[in-house]
Structure formats: structure tokens, C-alpha cells
């Protein structure tokens, strides 16, 4: 989540979620109008209003046509986004950078949500403070869990095999063979 400060955007997690909810509510209403217009005779097709590509994208997420990937570090943020997804009927495919995903590994597995996670990078800012080396392993090992080793740098992607080896070593350290 971003902090906008003087730029006029939300500066709290609650403000961000309020913005997301408003956007999805707008998309649901937009979708309803567009669907109603599409079911009318050809002469009334324009009653659905002007096409809005931003709302089309969110409507596509609600309809299941678009895979939703969300960037969240903290477990409480992930839980809130899962609640938002349930409220508006969309499915989250994956959380990226979820350094606290281990805290809700079983919920992620139950919801069919994957984690695209770092092997051992956390603590670089407050939102990323509570990570553990076993994060990927614990998310993946939950019944029906899904986690992949992630890198968002050109340098890190060249050594993804080494990042995966770190995950395996961390598993062995806590008694889990991979």
C-alpha cells in the first residue's frame, strides 16, 4: 500500500480499502447497467452509458475473466483483501511479496490463493518487518497450499535456483524435507 501524503490520495490502510471498496462498488453498478443495456433491443444498446476501461477491468475481475494478483506484505492486509474479494465476488489468484503469509497459510490454502514470495528478504520497512525464513515453505506445505519463489529484480531472477535452495535448507532446519 502506498502513502501519498500531500498528493491527495489515501494515507492509511483504512483509506486504501475504502477506495478499493468504492471502486469495486462502482464496477458492480457499471456491470449491472451494461448487462441490462445488452439485454435490450438493439435500439437501446446505448443506455448502458459510455464504456469505461477502468471499470471494465474491475468488472472482468468480478466476472472471473481477469486473474487478480495483489501486492501485500502483512497478514492483516491479505485477510482484508480476501474479505473484499468475497464481498464483491472476485477471486484472488496470488499475493505478491507477502512476508507475513505464513500467519494465514491455511486460510490462503483454503481460498486457493498462491503466494509469490521472497526466500529471505524482509525488514526493509515496517510493513515487511515480521517475515521469517520459513515463509514460503509454510505457505506451500499447508494442505492444498501454493507458493513460489519470487524475484522482482533482474539480478535475483538469475539466481532463482539459489533462492529455492535457501527455501529447501530452511525447511530442513525446521524438520521438513522438501
PLM features per residue range, with description:
Residues 75-79, 98-105, 155-157:
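Active-site environment of divalent metal-dependent phosphoester hydrolases
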Residues 90-97, 114-119:
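Short hydrophobic/aromatic-enriched beta-strand-loop microsegments
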